[in-house]
């Protein structure tokens, strides 16, 4: 380097969503790394922008029946865990205090069987220290509507968001299921009910059958498909939702490398969730962050935030 010339600045990966300042747009998705205990000392944490804790219910849940809970597919993973978790009391007394060691914005994820349960969960977490935001897992079944997911229709989704909004004053995230006819309509309903951020997509409903026994391979019969197989479908839904709402979007679904991450951001995501890839390779955050910086440097783009929603559709 010649005398007098300063070293070029590294491209910036920091983003801000509804007041949440993330050092990178990479978010560890709920359920992948649990409550973070096993990763508290991992150098990978410095490449993440936020950490979403495993979904918590009001009472402990054992999850789906014993037997196979995951099945690998040619380009993904089908899981049927059944929201196994120790319950809210254990989260407050044990899991959350431990998670605070992660030195990352922590996002709690909650799942209820009724609107009232969601509201109670939000209310009891409202005074908890160390939580930057609350994610509503509205892909779980509504027992008052015969097991239909809360996120399957705008009215139910909005009811959950509105009830939690009354109890929770920090950023509120609605995480949407893709197993609907019009996900943008549901996203708008959540925004109107008070959601500060929309996250999508959760897994796609799936089934795997053993052709010899003629029985499902999963102990719970049905599961959720994640991994690279769903990425193009997830990108489309992120694009449609980002076009429909005026709040930030967290995109996810099949992210595997820096190119996938940037694709979601160009489609409209302000941050990107990492899920199945972390199971395959826990070093993915560093690899993806490095790849993003390399791309930005080559393209002479100073900040990744400039790419958010920059897609230009072909004419016609």
Model-derived regions, located:
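Hydrophobic faces of well-ordered beta-strands that scaffold small-molecule active sites
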Residues: 26-30, 49-53, 106-110, 134-136, ...
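Conserved strand-to-helix beginnings and helix N-cap segments that scaffold or border functional pockets
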Residues: 39, 118-119, 184, 282-286
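Glycine-rich, proline-tolerant flexible connector loops at the mouths of alpha/beta enzymes
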Residues: 55-83, 134, 138-150, 203-213, ...
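Generic secondary-structure signature for well-ordered alpha-helical cores
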Residues: 96, 100, 127-130, 166-169, ...
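Alpha/beta enzyme core
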Residues: 113-250, 256-263, 267
């Amino acid at each position: 380097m010649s005398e007098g010339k300063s070293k070029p600045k590294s491209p910036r990966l920091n983003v801000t969503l509804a007041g949440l300042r993330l050092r990178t747009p990479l978010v560890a998705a709920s359920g992948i790394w649990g409550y973070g205990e096993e990763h508290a000392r991992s150098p990978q944490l410095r490449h993440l922008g936020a950490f979403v804790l495993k979904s918590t219910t009001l009472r402990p849940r054992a999850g789906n029946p014993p037997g196979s809970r995951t099945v690998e597919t040619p380009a993904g993973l089908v899981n049927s865990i059944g929201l196994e978790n120790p319950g809210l009391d254990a989260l407050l007394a044990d899991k959350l205090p431990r998670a605070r060691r992660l030195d990352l914005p922590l996002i709690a994820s909650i799942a209820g069987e009724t609107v009232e349960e969601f509201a109670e969960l939000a209310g009891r977490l409202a005074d908890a220290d160390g939580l930057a935001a609350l994610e509503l897992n509205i892909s779980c079944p509504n027992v008052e509507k015969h097991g239909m997911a809360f996120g399957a229709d705008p009215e139910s989704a909005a009811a959950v968001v509105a009830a939690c909004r009354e109890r929770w004053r920090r950023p509120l995230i609605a995480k949407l299921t893709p197993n609907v006819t019009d996900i943008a309509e549901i996203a708008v309903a959540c925004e109107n009910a008070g959601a500060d951020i929309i996250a999508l997509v959760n897994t796609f409903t799936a089934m795997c059958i053993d052709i010899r026994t003629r029985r499902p391979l999963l102990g719970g019969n049905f599961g959720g498909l994640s991994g690279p197989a769903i990425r193009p479908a997830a990108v489309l839904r992120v694009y449609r939702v980002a076009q429909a709402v005026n709040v930030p979007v967290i995109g996810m679904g099949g992210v595997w490398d820096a190119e996938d991450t940037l694709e979601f951001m160009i489609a409209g995501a302000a941050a990107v969730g990492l899920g199945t890839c972390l199971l395959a390779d826990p070093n993915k955050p560093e690899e993806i962050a490095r790849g993003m910086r390399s791309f930005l440097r080559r393209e002479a783009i100073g900040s990744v935030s400039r790419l958010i929603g920059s897609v230009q559709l072909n004419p016609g």
